[in-house]
């Protein structure tokens, strides 16, 4: 819904992954239900459960159903935004895996695994590392499999006089060559390229360069593709069009989105109706003002069922401008929401104690909306890899004048733990005391840090009045990294505040110490995700690495050491750690508030990007030995309408597919 709305926190990514994977057998949780479903390459696939959905009112259930359908209706948009050939490749893969008779089983499994990763990432690039992945089978075997599928009735949308071999040959490098367009997002491009030409995403035509955009003012910066024809740069707006506006890109998909939003209207609260109407207008016209009105209206609502739908996050765009399609449909978990409420009620307290200058401190005119939620559907950029925490909107002007909303995704965290355990602490923490603390406090501290990241991290601070644009305009491709680091640091800064014990959010200071221990270890285990090279491209990973490298190299509060032939990382001095956090937090807030691009560039380039390949290789090997996945992807619940004899909706049934392939093929209309 909002510009830069969904912040998938760096600490969320690092800390959730600290709760280690327990192997390849199915893990049973409540009612002996399966959570872990399978492992595809280094990604674990889990079933997400939405306990309590049945207790919602009928209107709330129906609202959730139609909103979920709206999210699914936009799925193909995210594929096309990710790469110009992603939809074509997706359709080819789905035709092969649904027409498998006669295909060599080993080759079929290779193609199926690649297809599952393609579904998870909405393209041939890992959505977190930004690095391209390729099939394990050779092109010739892939071609044979496609021919077998064609004989079985698979349709490959061939052009007139085009053969299947010709079609696949055109895509060979795109699918099989890891060195061809190696990164979907390249913020540190190689010599001779810029951040646009080195990035494979489809937000810009391949012939558009960064120089082309000098002096070019985008009217639809969040919701348009930039093209260049006859040397002239122009925007192709994402909208359906109406009597006053011509149809734009994705008009077919957005028309279906709008149709479902209209069906949701009768079941929405009055405030939600206002928000949905603004959203519908936005999808029709592309007008940024309608988008802004939707944001402000949405912030006024604190209903049980809530939603994020639209062009949201801009992480995939190296410029940090274009919003990726995504959606999250949820409801409040009344049993676990008190912590979020308590943090929100004390937002001004934490703001006042922030280590930055008073001129950058925000006055909270009202208590921010904050909840613990259970997710019933997540798609686009927000799924199947689902974030653990959300704060929105991130547009500074709206945040300062209208506030923000924060949520902790309770069932995502819970079911992530259904495929994780304590093996990371056993492998990567060196002392018995550290391991004991991690076992005792780890899960609790992770939740608290993520909650603070959202409520008092992203929701804090104000910028200098001399800034006439959003701070992201001034800080360019460095903004997202620094904003994620700022929210992480705000959580770490306040972890030892006695207010948390007073509010019974943390039991004691040992729980706070555990947070610092896990932060130090988390950056070490994060290295397993970067399989090649010596640079980090993802903003969330950069943010966590920036903090760790700063504390280790400049503050000397953390050290990496070896014992028994293994690398470990430990906190040398907890007080010094917190002092360093405060120092870095104050500087990043100053950079944001003043729009100091040169300082942003220096900080990120010095601490956030480079890694040690030898250390990375060791971490990968150790993680493989304990069956520790790089990521977790979720199969979300499925909702279906139940109607009585007269055709009236009498209920909404919730079910659990337990199968990634089954769900993705249904969403694609192929099952």
Language-model regions, residue ranges each:
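N-terminal-proximal low-complexity accessory segments that begin disordered
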Residues: 29-92
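An active-site-proximal "capping" alpha-helix that borders the catalytic cofactor pocket
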Residues: 57, 269, 480-497
């Amino acid at each position: 819904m909002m510009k830069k709305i969904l912040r998938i926190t760096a600490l969320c990514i690092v800390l959730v992954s600290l709760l280690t994977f327990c192997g390849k057998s199915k893990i049973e949780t409540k009612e002996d239900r399966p959570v872990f479903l399978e492992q595809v390459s280094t990604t674990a696939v889990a079933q997400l459960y939405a306990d309590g959905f049945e207790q919602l009112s009928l209107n709330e259930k129906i609202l959730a159903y139609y909103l979920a359908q709206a999210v699914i209706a936009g799925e193909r948009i995210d594929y096309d935004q990710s790469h110009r050939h992603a939809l074509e490749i997706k359709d080819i893969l789905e035709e092969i895996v649904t027409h498998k008779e006669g295909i060599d089983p080993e080759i079929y499994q290779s193609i199926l695994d690649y297809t599952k990763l393609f579904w998870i990432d909405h393209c041939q690039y890992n959505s977190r590392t930004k690095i391209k992945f390729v099939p394990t089978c050779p092109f010739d075997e892939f071609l044979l499999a496609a021919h077998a599928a064609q004989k079985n009735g698979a349709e490959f949308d061939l052009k007139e006089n085009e053969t299947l071999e010709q079609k696949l040959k055109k895509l060979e490098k795109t699918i099989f060559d890891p060195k061809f367009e190696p990164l979907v997002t390249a913020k540190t491009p190689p010599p001779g390229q810029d951040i646009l030409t080195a990035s494979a995403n489809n937000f810009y035509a391949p012939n558009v360069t960064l120089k082309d955009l000098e002096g070019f003012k985008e009217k639809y910066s969040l919701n348009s593709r930039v093209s260049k024809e006859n040397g002239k740069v122009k925007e192709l707006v994402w909208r359906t069009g109406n009597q006053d506006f011509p149809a734009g890109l994705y008009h077919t998909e957005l028309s279906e989105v709008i149709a479902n939003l209209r069906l949701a209207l009768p079941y929405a609260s009055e405030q939600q109706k206002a928000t949905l109407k603004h959203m519908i207008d936005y999808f029709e016209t592309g007008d940024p003002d309608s988008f802004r009105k939707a944001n402000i209206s949405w912030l006024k609502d604190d209903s049980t069922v809530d939603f994020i739908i639209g062009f949201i996050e801009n992480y995939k765009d190296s410029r940090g401008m274009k919003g990726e399609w995504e959606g999250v449909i949820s409801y409040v978990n009344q049993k676990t929401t008190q912590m979020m409420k308590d943090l929100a009620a004390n937002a001004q307290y934490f703001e006042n104690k922030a280590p930055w200058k008073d001129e950058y401190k925000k006055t909270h005119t009202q208590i921010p909306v904050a909840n613990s939620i259970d997710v019933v559907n997540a798609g686009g950029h927000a799924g199947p890899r689902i974030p653990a925490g959300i704060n929105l909107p991130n547009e500074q002007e709206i945040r300062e004048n209208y506030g923000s909303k924060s949520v902790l995704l309770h069932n995502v965290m819970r079911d992530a733990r259904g495929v994780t355990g304590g093996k990371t602490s056993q492998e990567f923490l060196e002392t018995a005391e550290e391991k004991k603390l991690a076992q005792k406090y780890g899960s609790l501290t992770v939740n608290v840090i993520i909650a603070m990241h959202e409520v008092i991290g992203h929701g804090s601070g104000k910028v200098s009045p001399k800034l006439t644009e959003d701070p992201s305009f001034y800080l360019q491709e460095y903004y997202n990294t620094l904003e994620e680091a700022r929210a992480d640091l705000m959580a770490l800064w306040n972890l030892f505040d006695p207010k948390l014990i007073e509010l019974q959010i943390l039991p004691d200071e040992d729980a706070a110490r555990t947070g610092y221990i896990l932060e130090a270890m988390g950056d070490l285990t994060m290295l397993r995700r970067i399989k090649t090279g010596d640079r980090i491209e993802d903003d969330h990973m950069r943010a966590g690495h920036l903090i760790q490298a700063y504390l280790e190299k400049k503050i000397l509060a953390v050290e990496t050491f070896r014992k028994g032939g293994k690398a470990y990382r430990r906190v040398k001095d907890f007080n010094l750690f917190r002092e360093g956090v405060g120092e870095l937090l104050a500087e990043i807030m100053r950079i944001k508030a003043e729009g100091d691009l040169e300082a942003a560039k220096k900080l990120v380039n010095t601490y956030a990007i480079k890694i040690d390949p030898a250390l990375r290789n060791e971490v990968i090997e150790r993680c493989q030995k304990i069956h520790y996945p790089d990521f977790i992807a979720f199969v979300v619940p499925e909702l279906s309408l139940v109607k009585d004899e007269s055709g009236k909706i009498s209920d909404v049934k919730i079910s659990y597919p337990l199968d990634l392939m089954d769900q993705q093929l249904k969403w694609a209309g192929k099952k």
